[in-house]
Design a protein with these regions (language model features):
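N-terminal loops that bind phosphate or other acidic moieties
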Residues: 1-123
Length: 123
């Protein structure tokens, strides 16, 4: 099973995961990690620990901001068979939950990027 880890500043990831559960129901394929009170190395350790549940199919690490401590920790974790996807939003995560079982792991990031961008509108 393809697994997802949300890595964010403070409670951003927890909040978006809670919203996703409210929309979709139980989401056992995603976990949220916060950087609050952690060094970059400690957060990288937590990411590695969370990735153990991913198995061989792969893990998508969703990071809130490029270049920040969460992104650095995600890169420092050096996960095998992983995609680090920066700039997540609710439509992207909903797409992950609903499509991860039907789209090959190598193609999934492009689909998620498209769906995430599709969820952004200026009116």
């Amino acid at each position: 099973m393809i697994y997802g880890i949300i890595v964010s500043h403070r409670n951003v990831g927890h909040g978006i995961l809670n919203a996703l559960v409210g929309m979709y129901g139980d989401v056992d394929c995603l976990v949220s990690l916060s950087n609050e009170g952690l060094s970059t190395n400690e957060l990288a350790d937590n990411i590695r620990e969370a990735a153990r549940f991913a198995g061989e199919e792969g893990v998508c690490v969703f990071v809130d901001a490029y270049g920040g401590s969460c992104w650095r920790a995600s890169k420092l974790a050096r996960l095998r068979n992983a995609h680090v996807i920066t700039g997540f939003n609710l439509p992207m995560l909903l797409s992950f939950v609903t499509k991860r079982a039907t789209i090959p792991f190598g193609e999934l990031p492009a689909v998620l990027e498209t769906d995430g961008k599709r969820g952004i509108r200026i009116e």
